[in-house]
Amino acid sequence: MSASSSGGSPRFPSCGKNGVTSLTQKKVLRAPCGAPSVTVTKSHKRGMKGDTVNVRRSVRVKTKNPPRCLEITPPSSEKLVSVMRLSDLSTEDDDSGHCKMNRYDKKIDSLMNAVGCLKSEVKMQKGERQMAKRFLEERKEELEEVAHELAETEHENTVLRHNIERMKEEKDYTILQKKHLQQEKECLMSKLVEAEMDGAAAAKQVMALKDTIGKLKTEKQMTCTDINTLARQKELLLQKLSTFEETNRTLRDLLREQHCKEDSERLMEQQGALLKRLAEADSEKARLLLLLQDKDKEVEELLQEIQCEKAQAKTASELSKSMESMRGHLQAQLRSKEAENSRLCMQIKNLERSGNQHKAEVEAIMEQLKELKQKGDRDKESLKKAIRAQKERAEKSEEYAEQLHVQLADKDLYVAEALSTLESWRSRYNQVVKDKGDLELEIIVLNDRVTDLVNQQQTLEEKMREDRDSLVERLHRQTAEYSAFKLENERLKASFAPMEDKLNQAHLEVQQLKASVKNYEGMIDNYKSQVMKTRLEADEVAAQLERCDKENKILKDEMNKEIEAARRQFQSQLADLQQLPDILKITEAKLAECQDQLQGYERKNIDLTAIISDLRSRVRDWQKGSHELTRAGARIPR
């Protein structure tokens, strides 16, 4: 805050981009860091006696410890003001500032709503992660049960292998038995042929015996030859029957042995079929073990992918936290800019009031000038009529009047210089307003970037949610496939072509997931580049604040130079006016006022140093905020 003047021209400080202290009518400003408050009153006084014109401005500084606040009172309407037109000031900036503030409030509300939505989505993601963890634990339990069943089937398979080895040994032994059985079959066939021949002979003998018995029945007389033939046929029949019985007995024995051998052969064939089935079961078991290993690998890959998703969710939450911190920082900047805007509006209103007061004081001074000129003319005429003897004194007074006219011309030049300085300060004020507009545009751009980052985070979360849903669906599918594999393992039926196709599809999906992970890494790199850009912008703002600090120092030096020039000028005027006894009292009063003004300037310098220290502390706070931004950008994982 600056209220210094040189020759009646008001001086305004260049406003920094972090904060601007304003001059308001009876406004209380809290001093930073617990410093005692200071009350500043501004008054402008212009007095003239005869043909002299003097433009002065006094700044009175009073310290008040009890309220500990900075109180600024406006100048009185009876004192001198600087020349400022009301047409130069308008309330359009105030209206536009209020509109922008409303827009910023709406944007902040939308950002708060977006952050609330993000928090709710993060909670939903946490619940989904817990559900996924429970689902994975259930799947792990099922896998453990399947592993236990596989261990039992392996034990059964080992027992079957031992039995198969024994059967193979018995098979080697039965090859010789088969050869022996072949020989026995040939022998049996020959025995069967003999038995058939014996049976045919016995049948013929029985037929012959029947014929002879029939003949005997018809003849009813038996000769010795008939008796002999009957005896012979009977003996032959008995022999044939005995041989037939022997062959039949041997044939039955052979048939019994053959049936036993056939039963043993059937058992061997059944054993061979069982061996084949066991071999097929072993091959199927090996295939199922390979498939189980592949499924275990896929489950591990899915767990790794879930861990990657968790890491991505953590990075997304960290990004949301950094965005919240950035949003808070931007809100603080926005509030500081709003306060700065309100201070500038109050300062403009105070300047309008001071301009009106200055106009009134200028008119009063012009009337005093006219009255003083008329009075001087009357005094001259009275002096010419009353005191003709004092010509030398009159000549001296005329010379002094000429000097006063010269001084009046100098004062007019001084007033013109004050007007030029006022114009320069007005241009600086316009530049400050322009810089403020640039800062507001930068804030709008930063808000747009924040919204873009929020949108990108939402798209990332949607993609992650879709990938997680696809992973859960794949887990369901794989569990269903695993149950199908379990049933096929129990039934020992093989057709694994569709499973191989599904495995190929799973590999393709894994490759697609890897590609999506690469895309996520690229998006994270983009976020890092955006954080670097914001860091560079923060550095630029810090550099602008440093430039503002330098400008404040330059203004302080210029103000000190102007104070010294005013002091010298008033001292020279005092030396000139001491020669005149009539205006001695006026010059003494002016000297006292000049001394008060010098003291006010010195106190103003103290206030300016306090303001500069405040600005430096704000610059440090800004640098701390930029360092926090850099730390937040460094926290983002690569």
UniProtKB/Swiss-Prot annotation:
Keywords: Cell projection, Cilium, Coiled coil, Cytoplasm, Cytoskeleton, Developmental protein, Differentiation, Flagellum, Isopeptide bond, Microtubule, Phosphoprotein, Spermatogenesis, Ubl conjugation. GO terms for cellular component: centriole; centrosome; cytoplasm; microtubule; sperm flagellum; sperm midpiece; sperm principal piece; spindle pole. Tyrosine phosphorylated. Phosphorylated on Ser-76 by TSSK4. There is a cross-link at K119 (Glycyl lysine isopeptide (Lys-Gly) (interchain with G-Cter in SUMO2)). It comes from the Eukaryota. Transmembrane segments: none annotated. Its main location: cytoplasm. The modification Phosphoserine is found at S76, S87, S90, S96, S110, S120, S242, S613. Self-associates. Associates with microtubules and forms a fibrillar structure partially linked to the microtubule network. Interacts via its C-terminus with PLK1. Interacts with ODF1. Localized at the distal/subdistal appendages of mother centrioles. Interacts with MARK4; the interaction is required for localization of ODF2 to centrioles. Interacts with TSSK4. Interacts with AKNA. Interacts with QRICH2. Interacts with CFAP58. Interacts with BBOF1. Interacts with CCDC38. Interacts with CCDC42. This is Outer dense fiber protein 2. It comes from Macaca fascicularis.
